[in-house]
Amino acid sequence: MTAVSLGIPAVPPPPLAPRRASRQIMVGSVPVGGGAPVSVQSMTTTLTADVNATLQQIAELTAAGCQIVRVAVPSQDDVAALPAIARKSQLPVIADIHFQPRYVFAAIEAGCAAVRVNPGNIRQFDDKVKEIAKAAGDAGVPIRIGVNAGSLDKRLLAKHGKATAEALVESALWECSLFEEHGFRDIKISVKHNDPVVMVRAYRQLAEACDYPLHLGVTEAGPAFQGTIKSSVAFGALLAEGIGDTIRVSLSAPPVEEIKVGAAILESLGLRERGLEIVSCPSCGRAQVDVYKLAEEVTAGLEGLPVPLRVAVMGCVVNGPGEAREADLGVASGNGKGQIFVKGQVIKTVPEGQIVETLIEEALRLAEEMGAELPEELRSLAGGATVTVH
């Protein structure tokens, strides 16, 4: 007799499948594939030729937690800027090459950590593979075969009718085979599409067909809200199956926002240690406090807190006490006041107007107890200082 036959739900499988076995490459100092942690990357939006602006944006990405950065190289002026950027960047730099095979050699010579090539729009690319493989191999520079639905080779479009998952995979594996003929396997692959369903199907096929590390991305995902949804759905499905070694959330938004979303996706799946997590109820007719405002003010007040801390902001006595007790720190609100919980214990009850101030003070105290080095803007608030929320 089984649990199912007794009407008892079977023991659920682990939430995530084991990571897919893949080769490992090094993008600068960052391992990709081979069981390494899933890395988060982004792409600069500056003119690469503007070295100072590009380095400034890379510094902002570094502070946000980015691990690898890609820069566009559409012109000779951009090529000329690569040596300075590669030398001064705090992150490994990937040169993004389209149309011009000769720029690949220039990027390798400039000291870039990796090169992305798009086989769909480099006409002479196939003829240059032998030379590229030798140059990249000699320099220890990996190549990303970056296939994109928007620039798929016309021959494959004619064969498949449109940019199907099968067409994307065929393009990627064909280009990989050309490198393999010359003994070069320091490769990672991406097969991006703007439709998450097609994208997921393509990566699943690719994961079964090869052992190269995979870079996940939904191309042209859209503005921040839409792009976040598309990437979260697609990445969540694949990463839960163990597929994916590095990710880039493409958003029509500042690059730093891509890093925030990417890191949050990994944290949500348990693939990265959680940072600050605000748990708040969606509010309903039972709420006796403005939950939206409380949650926003607590989030803003603790931005940059470098510890895995769960803070619950609850608006009523139904789920509030339970959620607050499960969190590291929380409040259950009602009747113009809030019960403050720390590690499951009520430590005080404060007037509604002091809830945000108290939560921030207690969060900073817990962070210091955990040995966290607080950012300058938070350090002055620690130690019981009064917090003013505007």
Swiss-Prot record:
Signal peptide: none annotated. Pathway: Isoprenoid biosynthesis; isopentenyl diphosphate biosynthesis via DXP pathway; isopentenyl diphosphate from 1-deoxy-D-xylulose 5-phosphate: step 5/6. Its cofactor is [4Fe-4S] cluster. Converts 2C-methyl-D-erythritol 2,4-cyclodiphosphate (ME-2,4cPP) into 1-hydroxy-2-methyl-2-(E)-butenyl 4-diphosphate. This is 4-hydroxy-3-methylbut-2-en-1-yl diphosphate synthase (flavodoxin). One of its GO terms (biological process) is isopentenyl diphosphate biosynthetic process, methylerythritol 4-phosphate pathway. Belongs to the IspG family. It comes from the Bacteria.
